[in-house]
Amino acid sequence: ATGARELVTPCAGCYKTFQKIYPEIGDLGLEVYHSIHYLEKLINDGRIKFKGDLGKKVTYHDPCDLGRAFKMFDEPRNILKQIPGLEYVEMARNGLKARCCGGGGGVLANNPEMAVEMAAERVRDALAVGAEIIASGCAACKDNLKKGAKAIPKQERGKIKIQDITEIVAGNLE
């Protein structure tokens, strides 16, 4: 044993496993955080300070494993809204009604073409509100949204970026 008291994971699927499945087997003896919760804790404790010079519009894609499983909707948006120089824009389909990107649930493994089409539709949702950055809290979503963006003609997708929320926070630390 490492003696660790906390475990932080940036993976939505791993977080779901540590929070919902492993406790059925036994007590981990750890406080488990998704990176979004941990970042929020650090911000609220004053341990993270932001600079802000991006001047970009950002939106948040709700990963199925965080949104539907844990109702984690406000926390990531609150983090993004605290970064100076970022303008938060909300996609029409968000929260429980957010469109799945196709990166999880076996879609990508069983029907990769459909998964990319689903991701492209989600990227179009972000483009429709003028977003220049799509943030997410799930590596599978990030990777599949990137594939979806590449499937959209360059003149339509522009220079939209797909980033994990931890990357956005790290890039804007004081």
Spans of model-derived segments:
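Iron-sulfur cluster-binding electron-transfer modules in prokaryotic oxidoreductases
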Residues: A1-E174
